[in-house]
Amino acid sequence: MHSSSSFIITSLEEEEKKPPAHHLHQQSIEDVGSVTSSATLLLLDSATWMMPSSTTQPHISEISGNECAACAQPILDRYVFTVLGKCWHQSCLRCCDCRAPMSMTCFSRDGLILCKTDFSRRYSQRCAGCDGKLEKEDLVRRARDKVFHIRCFQCSVCQRLLDTGDQLYIMEGNRFVCQSDFQTATKTSTPTSIHRPVSNGSECNSDVEEDNVDACDEVGLDDGEGDCGKDNSDDSNSAKRRGPRTTIKAKQLETLKNAFAATPKPTRHIREQLAAETGLNMRVIQVWFQNRRSKERRMKQLRFGGYRQSRRPRRDDIVDMFPNDQQFYPPPPPSNVQFFCDPYTTSPNNPETIQMAPQFAVPTENMNMVPEPYTEQSATPPEFNEDTFACIYSTDLGKPTPVSW
């Protein structure tokens, strides 16, 4: 036991000093480090007996004349009992609980004189596994600040007793998992097989970017409202691996809804309080809040216009929307017209590698056309008469009307 729970075995001696305190001899489990996922890895040492290290026989002195520590009367008896550096009458040295006389040994703690039975009832440690009493002849194992019976120190998954030299992992709630079960659970990544390991880091790390976790792939929640467990086809059901579904009762659901209305993204401390109040696992509560926030976002999108464009519009989309309006994009050039715009591939100073500058290529069907002969124009300028000068103006399509000035 720790120093805070130590007790003192005293005896009746003649004017001696306070004897040293005797501790229950217990073997601690040696902490050899930590492993992945921040789970604490422990190596079991050999178990020891749960019993006091030594006891002393009572010794009665024949010195009198001192005052009794119990009744404050002078001790005129032939024999005097000395306990904790104080003198006692033989009739005054009794257990504070059962009032039995202390004739052999006594136990003292917090200023109380107790017999062995009452001291065990008050201060003896109890097994953290079965909450049973630890007797002095019991073999025990210690993990952190907990003491276990040998029969109670077992893996919480396979129920195998952990022996000396075995490696184990301490999980949440002082549960122990053997190495093989921990590795199996880590590979399968099933959140309901074991809890997440205890981490020495800050608790706020679990509250950062919780929405990035795909909650639907890990735990299915069945609260009557969630859309997480609904799929559109049988292919999606076979493609996604789902964990066991958790049924949330009406009272638990009401508690979660009230907490969501107050804090849509609760901290770890609030989730722990909700877990204690509803009896649900913290992981289930975290996934429920994630699904609820996702549902609120979807409802808000549907309520305020809802459509969110997933890509930029293309030319075909615009043409389909306005089939009679081609002002957005001009029509493509004819297929018989080709444009060549080839840059220089090497230095232009080398005449062997110089290519032609960008030019317009004439269609092949027009290459054999004979140009018309050149005729010299007359040097006399043309004459115009204002009376015969007319402009064409028409109201009827296809019927020009001459207009004289």
UniProtKB/Swiss-Prot annotation:
One of its GO terms (biological process) is cell fate specification. One of its GO terms (cellular component) is nucleus. Residues 68-124, 127-187 form the LIM zinc-binding domain. Residues 241-300 bind DNA. Its main location: nucleus. InterPro entries: HD (IPR001356), Homeobox_CS (IPR017970), Homeodomain-like_sf (IPR009057), Lhx1/5_LIM2 (IPR049619), LIM_Homeobox_TF (IPR050453), Znf_LIM (IPR001781). Residues 189-205 have a biased composition (Polar residues). There is a cross-link at residues 17-18 (Glycyl lysine isopeptide (Lys-Gly) (interchain with G-Cter in SUMO)). It is found in: Nucleus. GO terms for molecular function: DNA-binding transcription factor activity; DNA-binding transcription factor activity, RNA polymerase II-specific; RNA polymerase II transcription regulatory region sequence-specific DNA binding; zinc ion binding. Gene3D superfamilies: Cysteine Rich Protein, Homeodomain-like. Expressed in ADL, AVJL, AIZL, RICL, RIF and AVG neurons. Keywords: Developmental protein, DNA-binding, Homeobox, Isopeptide bond, LIM domain, Metal-binding, Nucleus, Repeat, Transcription, Transcription regulation, Ubl conjugation, Zinc. Signal peptide: none annotated. Residues 189-208, 224-246 are annotated as: Disordered. Probable transcription factor which is required for asymmetric division of vulval blast cells. Involved in olfactory plasticity probably by regulating the expression of transcription factor mbr-1 in RIF neurons. Plays a role in the chemorepulsive response toward ascaroside pheromones mediated by the ADL sensory neurons, probably by regulating E-box motif 5'-CANNTG-3' containing target genes in the ADL neurons. Plays a role in the differentiation of the ADL sensory neurons. This is Protein lin-11. It comes from Caenorhabditis elegans. The lineage of its organism: Eukaryota, Metazoa, Ecdysozoa, Nematoda, Chromadorea.
